[in-house]
Amino acid sequence: MKSIGLLSDTHSHIDGDILNFFKDVDEIWHAGDIGNMNVVHQLKAIKPVRAVFGNIDGTEVRSHFKEVESFTCENMNVVMVHIGGYPGKYAPGIKSLLQKSGANLFVCGHSHILKVMYDKILGIMHINPGAAGMSGFHYKRTAIRFVVDNQDIIIYS
């Protein structure tokens, strides 16, 4: 069993509220639009970090992270990208990527809208944590914590 802190779209902003929100998780995943490496350094100071770069990320961030991250967490196959869409309206190439990968969990960001939904057609859980940063059209900063237990996902606040 592993607890995960998930955020996206920090756009160079990280603060004590976010760091405190993640203090009890095992790993932090960042779904892109990090902004700068200072965000990553602050997250890594408290927990191990997995991340992908997003469309606003420059050369420095892109030199440390990939566009697509595929990995296994507690027997769950995970695919993480920044621009991914959502079930029924995936970004170009994403549905094919998910089908080929055998993913059980798809994580993305970009929309600045927190959304957790199950894709009944592909049999994949989709999680977008919304935006944890200050830049954008969102009114509320969001992030999410969940537990991966074998092939189960338990979301908690």
Descriptions of predicted regions:
Residues M1-V49, D57-N75, M80, Y139-T142:
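N-terminal active-site segment of His-dependent metallophosphoesterases
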Residues K2, C73-E74, S101-G102, I127-S157:
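Binuclear metal-dependent phosphoesterase catalytic core
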Residues S12-G16, G35-V39, I56-R62, G85-Y90, ...:
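Active-site environment of divalent metal-dependent phosphoester hydrolases
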Residues L43-I46, L98-S101, I121:
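Short, conserved loop/helix-junction motifs that constitute active-site signature segments
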Residues V49-D57, L98-K100, M125-A131:
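Short Pro/Gly-enriched beta-strand edge/turn motifs at strand-loop
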Residues V52, H82, L105-F106, H112, ...:
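Acidic/histidine-enriched, beta-strand-rich ligand/metal-binding domains
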Residues E69-S70, K115-Y118, T142-F146:
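Short beta-strand scaffold segments in enzyme catalytic cores
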Residues N77-S111:
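Internal catalytic-core helix/loop-beta-alpha segment
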